[in-house]
Design a protein with these regions (language model features):
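Membrane-interface "cap" regions at the ends of multi-pass membrane proteins
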Residues: 1-39, 53, 172-175, 182-186, ...
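C-terminal membrane-solvent junction of multi-pass transporters and transport-like membrane proteins
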Residues: 2, 369-454
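Extracellular loop-to-transmembrane helix junctions
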Residues: 29-60, 82, 87, 97, ...
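Membrane-water interface regions at transmembrane-helix termini and the short interhelical loops
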Residues: 30-35, 60-62, 77, 85, ...
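Transmembrane alpha-helical segments of multi-pass small-molecule transport proteins
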Residues: 87, 114-151, 166-175, 213-228, ...
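Selective recognition of specific alpha-helical transmembrane segments in multi-pass small-molecule
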Residues: 20-24, 47-55, 89-101, 165-182, ...
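Hydrophobic alpha-helical segments and their helix-loop junctions in multi-pass secondary transporters
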Residues: 102, 106-115, 167-197, 220, ...
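Membrane-interface loop-to-helix entry segments
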Residues: 89, 100, 137-181, 191-192, ...
Length: 480
């Protein structure tokens, strides 16, 4: 059982630390580059985070009530061994985020070197990779730096975590101040009209961009909506976890999104085009001392947050699958390797790759898992779990060979409507029927609905082994 000492303030502060990162900034800036006005972009981010807050709070409930982390909670619905499925799904996505953050760190090093007056980097792009030799070297150097940290153990980076988020807040505010001065105030900064307005270059196309963007916003934090019990298990009460999350996630995300939106809008005035990547923007500012220091600190901050957020979880998931063969270091090396093979720079070339391929594709996997966890806990079990049974190999959650057929079937069926659309968006296939592209646009919502409904039906249709589904003693649960 976890010690329960986190208050509303602790839960809210947790979200401040997680929200303030470069991908969050790029998320909002990418909407400006897609043609939205600042109001449309900020409202899209806010709405997406309000939506994902719902499964976040719901999945946080069992963490607070029973003190169990995500991998243990998943045993109730997927089975003792079947719980490896959602854990590995979450781990695979963390590997992707590791690659994206590694590219951000490598790009910061590239811009840092270019900002030095005696160094000029560039050159033709390498075949297959699509980036030049210097960019490749900076990416691999930052990747190798993280591998060294993994080898030494995650504790070697703890001291940096304490100031990573504060620095990024300062950097964001500094960029906002710079944009304010350069663009001539908030009036000109935020005056850039929506390209979807009547007579604009994208007149009549707003909804075709808004809905997939909204799905991408939900997908951005859908990973945390699964393993949020890892944090809410420390909350003193349901009130603390609910209110803390409600304060911390949508408000911080909206405010940080505004910084990204305002600065990106200002770059349209300053440079004649929207610059949504802060590392590229810092590089465009020139080689001043403050820019060099900012790029260096951004590199260190990205290193610390990437190890903590995107190595620990997948490494632990791999250890759970094969505890005798996988150590934390081996799990970290596998994560680092997979982070390269996704070619993260391809995803970040433009908002289409980042939002429409990566974030929506991620949401197609995470929505179904979240739905199964929620339906199992609230609908099937009425919030009552056999706490001891979650830790017994032959207990009530062993199902059939350690797997719950209802959960596995529901998860697989939920991928059918969105998989063709993802294959088309990722350019794995040439064409698909238009209805699959449409369903992919709503991937998280479609997957959540299909998995939730199918799981509820299958749990009634498929005969379940006799289980002792008795509530745990009151002393084991947190204050309601």
């Amino acid at each position: 059982m976890a010690e329960r000492h986190w208050s509303i303030w602790n839960m809210a502060s947790l979200w401040v630390g997680m929200v303030v990162c470069v991908p969050s900034y790029m998320l909002a800036g990418g909407l400006i580059k897609q043609g939205m006005s600042w109001v449309e972009a900020v409202m899209t981010v806010m709405l997406g985070n309000v939506i994902v807050l719902v499964p976040m709070i719901l999945n946080g409930h069992p963490g607070t009530k029973y003190g169990v982390p995500f991998p243990v909670l998943a045993r109730a619905s997927f089975g003792i061994h079947g719980a490896h499925i959602p854990s590995l799904v979450r781990a695979a996505i963390a590997c992707g985020w590791f690659g994206i953050q590694t590219w951000v760190g490598g790009a910061a090093i590239y811009q840092l070197l270019n900002a030095l007056p005696w160094i000029t980097l560039g050159g033709a792009d390498l075949p297959v990779l699509g980036i030049n030799a210097a960019e490749t070297a900076c990416f691999l150097f930052f990747w190798a730096l993280q591998v060294v940290v993994i080898y030494k153990g995650v504790e070697s980076i703890r001291i940096l975590e304490t100031w990573a988020a504060p620095f990024l807040i300062i950097m964001g505010l500094a960029l906002l101040a710079w944009a304010y001065v350069k663009a001539g105030g908030f009036g000109p900064m935020l005056a850039t009209p929506s390209q979807f307005a009547p007579g604009g270059p994208k007149d009549g196309q707003f909804w075709s961009v808004f809905f997939p963007s909204l799905t991408g916003m939900v997908g951005f934090w859908a990973t945390l909506s699964l393993n949020i019990p890892d944090f809410t298990r420390y909350a003193k009460s349901q009130k603390d976890q609910m209110i803390g999350q409600a304060i911390g996630l949508p408000t911080t995300m909206t405010l940080f999104a505004f910084i990204g939106v305002a600065v990106t809008s200002a770059t349209t005035i300053i440079y004649g085009e929207p610059v949504w990547d802060p590392t590229v923007l810092l590089g465009k500012m020139g080689g001043g001392f403050s820019v060099v220091i900012s790029l260096f600190a951004l590199t260190i901050a990205t290193l610390s947050t990437n190890i903590a957020a995107n190595v620990v979880s997948p490494a632990n998931a791999m250890i759970n699958v094969a505890p005798r063969k996988v150590t934390f270091q081996i799990g970290g090396y596998i994560t680092a390797g997979l982070g390269i093979v996704i070619f993260p720079w391809k995803l970040l070339e433009d908002p289409n790759g980042y939002i429409f391929t990566w974030l929506i594709g991620v949401s197609a996997l995470l929505g179904p898992v979240g739905a199964i966890l929620i339906v199992d806990y609230f609908v099937v079990r009425k919030t009552e779990l056999d706490l001891d049974g979650l830790y017994r190999k032959k207990g009530p959650y062993f199902y059939r060979g350690g797997f719950n057929p209802a959960a596995v079937i529901a998860f697989c069926l939920s991928l059918v409507p969105t998989l063709p659309g993802f294959a088309h968006q990722a350019k794995l296939v040439g064409t698909v029927p238009p209805m699959f592209d449409t369903m992919y646009t709503y991937a998280w919502f479609v997957g959540f609905a299909v998995a939730g409904v199918m799981y509820a039906i299958l749990m009634r249709v498929i005969p379940q082994p006799a289980v002792a589904n008795e509530p745990v003693p009151a002393a084991a649960t947190a204050e309601e």
